Amino acid sequence: MKSLAGHVVKYGKHRERRSFARISEVLELPNLIEIQTDSYQWFLDEGLREMFEDILPIDDFQGNLSLEFVDYELKEPKYTVEEARAHDANYSAPLHVTLRLTNRETGEIKSQEVFFGDFPLMTEMGTFIINGAERVIVSQLVRSPGVYFHGKVDKNGKEGFGSTVIPNRGAWLEMETDAKDISYVRIDRTRKIPLTVLVRALGFGSDDTIFEIFGDSESLRNTIEKDLHKNASDSRTEEGLKDIYERLRPGEPKTADSSRSLLTARFFDPKRYDLANVGRYKVNKKLDLKTRLLNLTLAETLVDPETGEIIVEKGTVLTHQIMETLGEYIDNGLNSVTYYPSEDAVVTEPMTIQVIQVLSPKDPERIVNVIGNGYPDDSVKTVRPADIVASMSYFFNLMEDIGNVDDIDHLGNRRIRSVGELLQNQFRIGLARMERVVRERMSIQDTETLTPQQLINIRPVVASIKEFFGSSQLSQFMDQTNPLGELTHKRRLSALGPGGLTRDRAGYEVRDVHYSHYGRMCPIETPEGPNIGLINSLSSYAKVNKFGFIETPYRRVDRATGRVTDQVDYLTADIEDHYIVAQANSLLNEDGTFANDVVMARLQSENLEVAVDKVDYMDVSPKQVVAVATACIPFLENDDSNRALMGANMQRQAVPLIQPRSPWVGTGMEYKSAHDSGAALLCKHDGVVEFVDAKEIRVRRDNGALDKYMVTKFRRSNSGTSYNQRPIVHLGEKVEKGDTLADGPSMEEGEMALGQNVLVAFMTWEGYNYEDAIIMSRRLVKDDVYTSVHIEEYESEARDTKLGPEEITREIPNVGEDALKDLDEMGIIRIGAEVQDGDLLVGKVTPKGVTELSAEERLLHAIFGEKAREVRDTSLRVPHGGGGIVHDVKIFTREAGDELSPGVNMLVRVYIVQKRKIHEGDKMAGRHGNKGVVSRIMPEEDMPFLPDGTPVDIMLNPLGVPSRMNIGQVLELHLGMAARQLGIHVATPVFDGATDEDVWETVREAGMASDAKTVLYDGRTGEPFDNRISVGVMYMIKLAHMVDDKLHARSIGPYSLVTQQPLGGKAQFGGQRFGEMEVWALEAYGAAYTLQEILTYKSDDVVGRVKTYEAIVKGEPIPKPGVPESFRVLVKELQSLGLDMRVLDIEEAEIELRDMDDDDDDLITVDALTKFAEQQSAKQLEKEAESVVKEEAQDVVQEIETAEDRD
């Protein structure tokens, strides 16, 4: 028997799939959220300490007191993760820092532990809990500090160069040439200064010294001619210093001293200027002589300074081989020259640089100096004079065609700032603010009694951390629609945010796909719209190194034997540029050598066919190019990239269903993505399941200890979907560390399960699937196939008001007993009650202002001592479309010790659950960007059926496929049908999945027709349709855009205060905008009255709309419309400009415009309907009250009279 296509692979303990992959993967996928967890761990272990050591010790102004850092410790968190969620608190731990205060005068030392505020902790899932809500800190993609060179062309077509030294924080130093070939520098974006002025200020004043350092070049000569010695009484260095000061501080008196201190502060003070580790690494790498000298011709003989032997002869071309031997000598300081700056320079320490002379590639007669910065140590975080001189040398070398310009969009020049670093930067801001306070307190307070505790004010530190988590652009409310959305959010990279780009200024180049993204950033997954290309996703295998550059793994190729080894190297983008990398699908022999002599490979931006002996590396996996969500799309290689983008983005919007089913046609990523998302309950230690029910799982460890795992049931997720876990292990089952114990939402058997496998036919039906609409069988509604559970939270708080406290009570004015039937004695709804729109959830009354009493009422009060308890009903009611079943009620009170915000005495939260079946108007999609809206749900018996009588579930329009070029859906359809017939699950990994032959092979094996199509019969008549139709199984998901959330209608409602027009949007209970084009449509029909009422009563004719409402209620004819408010505003604006504007009618009589006087205040500010209703009921009550009061007053008068008679 012929062997079947594919081979069986096990995913987790519970699922087997037939995989069509041909490439064996040598490397497991990394933990998908380690970009979050590792970064935060680094911050706790090293980042915090680095921060304290940077800022402390703090000395006072006299230098007598010194506050030093000893150690820090994070204590036990106040709340667990679950408690923090329940109490709306932060999941955080108190940070205690041990400080030592030394008094240098007395020699006294005081040590003390100081509380530094609560520090938010990261949960195991890579999220933070801030005010009870889960948040994610998105990693930021920024330009790396370092030295960059760029080419530019001026308006006359002359080529020039520019250079920029960018620190992590501090002033920029830019160099540029002008049309006359004079070189200039700019300090911190100010006016430009001739480049030699800065060299002189650094202490190398004479022209001869400058030529000695840099060698002869045309641009340098032009610059020196421009930079004349103007004032003979100043030395050249002092004059240079004054020139710079004049540019940086124009208008201030210039002295050499002030300029020295200014330049020192700008560039050489570690507190003000910081290159950071990454900046120092990039500067050293760019100015490294080993890369700059490659392929140049030596103009001098290089001699070993220790032995005197010749290393390389003059006139030699420096090839790779020669550079390998020369490299060691360069690292050890070959050809180092030390220059001593003059006494009046900014930096007086000697400057050591490496100078090697080569011939210019432009003019082989000319000798050029190539200067290296002498490799300052990693601990040197500021820029040194040697760096400035070496970067100037690089700048001059570019004019001789030595060196190369940088591409800023290359991922070697962009780096990731993850949580740890973002937090560290924020913490630094707080500590710097605190430092000022400490200095001030040191000078004010008595030094004898001073303790560290008295010096420290932790407010600025706490505030900066709070501000970062609460309101930073990078601290985002977690997308928790489903586990894939969660996972993707944690792996997101944003170029926006503080210190990044802005949407409006980001050009096309920044957003575009770059060749260096390969294996580092997904080229497909990015939002559509204004953020396209600015927000990206980390590729599946990518990691972030200690400098923040993204690395991707490659298998090393042994050049000697030609074998592809299993050794994996992680390369950053700039290192990868030097190598030739073969594709992952290159065919290999048994022994690991390449099967063909020529393979497809990449070198920088080129795709080449390369002989195998030239290849250095090979991709580890075909899916290393794409992100996790993209890797979940089967047959991705057959889809157009625009549609794949939609497919990846829409999977994140899938609503978790009641009965999740993982796809029959998967990619093999379903298990890993669900496992790492944080939604599954994972086993922490090996052991045996000892107890399992819906609430709890207990595992007995091998060492006898017992682990308890709580299963989360029906919790509301951030996006209002149900977060529910279901155990999948059995009593007595052996489990290992990392096994899935319980499925989370949208998971089945440990795999991601976003949708359902449904029977789909590509056919039109009576025009109901025009324009991507979807026709669906009622079976999917009846059997709850696409039913989801949604939980909404409503809260009501009882506050203290000026007129007295609000009260949560059952006693509500003007509410019948029937409305109170589900409230308990406190006036709070019972759990399990079914509620409709407008029902009471929490009864609450607010004191009203005591009204002025009439004489009779005052008399009554005097006699009966009754206080008029005037209260307003401010109960919490179910909003429109919010009806369902009360799932939970939480009550927080001060007495119970709950932390409530000031002025709140009690807080009640009610959770209402809705079961939403699929509905016409709901949005659905496949995984290939094939989205549509359900247009008709048909009875099962009317749906077309297969020859065996099975009715299809969904009909899609075949016209949606060819123009969209997402053919993957058709392949999925056929393979899915075969999988259904064979009763198997299949995996077809991206770029290495089932080929056409595999699909047809599986179709044959399943006993389907050779074209995989079938005859379909009309469910209404039983007649077969004319042509054979493609029918198969496709994985369709229901998206979070449901019609229940969008449907909205208003008759009357709130109006905007300024324009008096109805508000807009469902959330404001607004109206529908009748815009300019809609007005044209009515004008075209001549519907004058309809148009008039739309522009008056229904919009901003304030008086007219109230009168109209009254007329409708009383059944009277509708009055004529008045003047719209917007017209009145226009007239008033013209009057305010001094124009005498009046409005006349047909008889030229003036029309009075309503003035904003007190009579109309109520009309303007209060919703007309409620106002009218209140007036009516008030009149009614007044009449009743009057008659009661009169009767009672008469009784009282009679009693008094009778009493008088008796007397």
Curated annotation (Swiss-Prot):
GO biological process per UniProt = DNA-templated transcription
Role? DNA-dependent RNA polymerase catalyzes the transcription of DNA into RNA using the four ribonucleoside triphosphates as substrates.
Q: Return the similarity comment.
A: Belongs to the RNA polymerase beta chain family.
Name of the protein in its database record: DNA-directed RNA polymerase subunit beta
Q: Name one Pfam family in it.
A: RNA_pol_Rpb2_6
Upper lineage is: Bacteria, Bacillati, Bacillota, Bacilli, Lactobacillales
The species this protein belongs to is Enterococcus faecalis (strain ATCC 700802 / V583)
Keyword Nucleotidyltransferase belongs to the record: yes
Which EC number(s) are documented for this chain? 2.7.7.6
The record's keywords, sorted A to Z, are: DNA-directed RNA polymerase, Nucleotidyltransferase, Transcription, Transferase
> Cross-referenced PROSITE patterns, in alphabetical order?
RNA_POL_BETA
Q: Which domain of life is it from?
A: Bacteria
Q: How does this protein assemble? A: The RNAP catalytic core consists of 2 alpha, 1 beta, 1 beta' and 1 omega subunit. When a sigma factor is associated with the core the holoenzyme is formed, which can initiate transcription.
- Keyword GTP-binding part of the UniProt annotation: no
The GO cellular component terms are: DNA-directed RNA polymerase complex
